[in-house]
From Swiss-Prot:
GO terms (BP aspect): tetrahydrofolate biosynthetic process
Name of the protein this chain belongs to: GTP cyclohydrolase FolE2 2
Protein EC: 3.5.4.16
Keyword Transcription regulation included in the entry's annotation: no
Chain positions of site May be catalytically important: C152
Organism: Dechloromonas aromatica (strain RCB)
InterPro entries, per database record: GTP_cyclohydrolase_FolE2, GTP_cyclohydrolase_FolE2/MptA
Keywords assigned: Hydrolase
Length: 270
């Protein structure tokens, strides 16, 4: 025998007597299709992993988890970077919250041309759009993980021939005041690495990238400083965090460095 909806208890809406607010509560790691416009004027259809949270006042026992999924499905396949702020607003309205947070992580593909042979191939990059809303005010940022090659200056200096090199991940999280293509952030990072990566290389290309890295050695410290200098000079970037992790080829650990800067509040990270 079915029970009328009006008679089903709403436990989440009941009062909580502990009087402790929750900063973030919601759903994590839910996949949903999205579309992303790329710089070549094409549309990439991909799958994003979403984390969606709201703040919960001290006097409420719980939030309504099903409503997060309803928000995703209400947009069907029309979720994009452009309507990301709309999703934030919809979420706090539907969840009756003052604050909200959404992370949208997805693979992004860029067509790259090999440096000598000219063969083309796709490279994938890990991208996350991050949005926060507090009392109607929205703040967004983009996080891009760029895989590159790094070659050790010390190894080159002390060795009679060769030098140890490895793949590195340079991660830029940027808060911008104007639109920036994902490709622009990727290119900025790749230009400051020992060498960029490619999906497909022929033998002449492999020779080129090997020698390019050897002629352009960089410590992990060099990498974050050089990328930070470029971001400092980029007027569209208000604040950033740049990280570099070198997956050391001669050690069983990584080398790591981080620089963060809020240009509007330079003393914040002094």
């Amino acid at each position: 025998m079915s029970t009328p909806t009006s008679n089903i208890p709403d436990v989440q809406n009941s009062a909580d007597t502990r009087h402790i607010a929750i900063n973030k509560v919601g759903i994590k790691s839910i996949r949903h299709p999205i579309k992303v416009q790329d710089k070549s004027a094409g549309i990439q259809h991909t799958i994003a992993m979403f984390n969606m949270y709201v703040g919960l006042p001290h006097n409420f026992k719980g939030t309504h988890m099903s409503r997060f999924v309803e928000i995703l499905n209400s947009h069907e396949r029309e979720i994009s970077v452009e309507n990301f702020p709309t999703m934030l607003r919809d979420m706090v309205v539907k969840l009756e919250a003052e604050t909200g947070h959404i992370e949208m992580n997805f693979p992004y593909f860029i067509n790259k041309t090999a440096p000598v042979s000219g063969v083309q191939s796709l490279m994938d990059y890990d991208v996350t759009f991050i949005g926060d809303i507090c009392h109607g005010e929205i703040a967004t940022s983009v996080k891009v993980v760029v895989p590159v090659t790094s070659l050790c200056p010390c190894s080159k200096k002390i060795s009679e021939y060769g030098a140890h090199n490895q793949r590195s991940h340079v991660t830029v999280t940027a808060k911008t005041n104007d639109f920036m293509w994902i490709e622009e952030i990727v290119q900025l990072v790749e230009q400051e690495a020992s060498c960029e990566l490619f999906g497909l290389l022929k033998r002449p290309d492999e020779k080129y990238v090997t020698e390019r890295a050897y002629d352009n050695p960089k410590f992990v410290e060099d990498m974050v400083r050089d990328v930070a200098a470029r971001l400092n000079a980029e007027a569209r970037v208000d604040a950033y965090v740049v990280e570099s992790e070198n997956f050391e080829s001669i050690h069983n650990h990584s080398a790591y460095a981080l620089i963060e800067n809020d240009k509007k509040n330079p003393l914040a990270h002094a």
